Amino acid sequence: ACLVGSEMCIRDRWKTNPDYPNGWFTYDAIAPELIEYVKENGYNYIELMPICEHPCDSSWGYQNTGYFSPTSRYGTAQQLMRLIDLCHQAGVGVLLDFVPVHFALDDYGLARFDGTNLYEYPHPDVGVSEWGSCNFMHSRGEVRSFLQSSAWFWLEKFHFDGLRMDAISRILYWQGDENRGVNRDGEAFLRVMNAGLKQRCPGCMLIAEDSTQYPGVTHPVETGGLGFDYKWDMGWMNDTLDFFRTPPEKRSKHYHKLTFSMLYFPRETYLLPLSHDENVHGKATILQKMYGDYEDKFPQARALYLYMMMHPG
């Protein structure tokens, strides 16, 4: 069956509700509307953007502090379990956006946990990420065990169907910079974690968000790959959206943006994303990205989604 998923940020979709004690909708409250929306729009999976406990109500949750606790903003762990169970009963799979790259700097988190750089690199050059957070030191066995245990915890205890791992280029390359070379400890960490998760939960889905040319992301660990099931095709997303922004009379010179992905798609097993990264910070919605007047945008958006559904992969 075709995998058709929708990213879900509970905070952005349901905002706040003054009728609830802490001002947020609960997992129980959103379940009926969420499932109805997903089914009506033909999705068979949802991907919950990070729900590990995190500081800052306005954030998307990518800088975690609690790797074994769902955020209490939306209710209890048991309520989240019920939400996932109801999705499964409706035939909808649930994936979790998992962040094994970096964590929040806040004092009540993992930074300098025992007064030393226990989880993070001691050198600022590689210890602090581009987002101002702490990079995990994947060379330490204790750190690897912590992250592997967290990943398994969400699959085993909450019955998530899989994990989408965020920004793995920052694990594979020092600070995500291919010119600085491969981080062999990070590379080994991903292989060991993915192999272990597949051994304990053979049916789980492991998805990599990676925009680099690192080879073998979706190849088996046994043959030297990283062991992911799918890799986001970020190049397809950027090229395709650029094409649809182009005035129609100039598109004949830009057809390569539609066809280039056909040259490399056999190398990996790709998922085609149209992700939150493309409408954050004023980048506009998919409809707004289409060229032309308001009414002209709709047929182009339909063509975009049709191309996405029919693309090989």
Please tell me what each predicted stretch does.
Residues 2, 76, 186:
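Short, conserved glycine- and acidic-residue-centered signature motifs
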Residues 2-10:
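Short, small-residue-biased leader/transition segments that mark boundaries at the very start
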Residues 6-7, 64, 269:
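Extracellular structured ligand-interaction cores
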Residues 11-160, 164-182:
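Substrate-binding/active-site clefts of carbohydrate-active enzymes
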Residues 159-161, 173-313:
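Conserved alpha/beta catalytic core and glycan-binding cleft of carbohydrate-active enzymes
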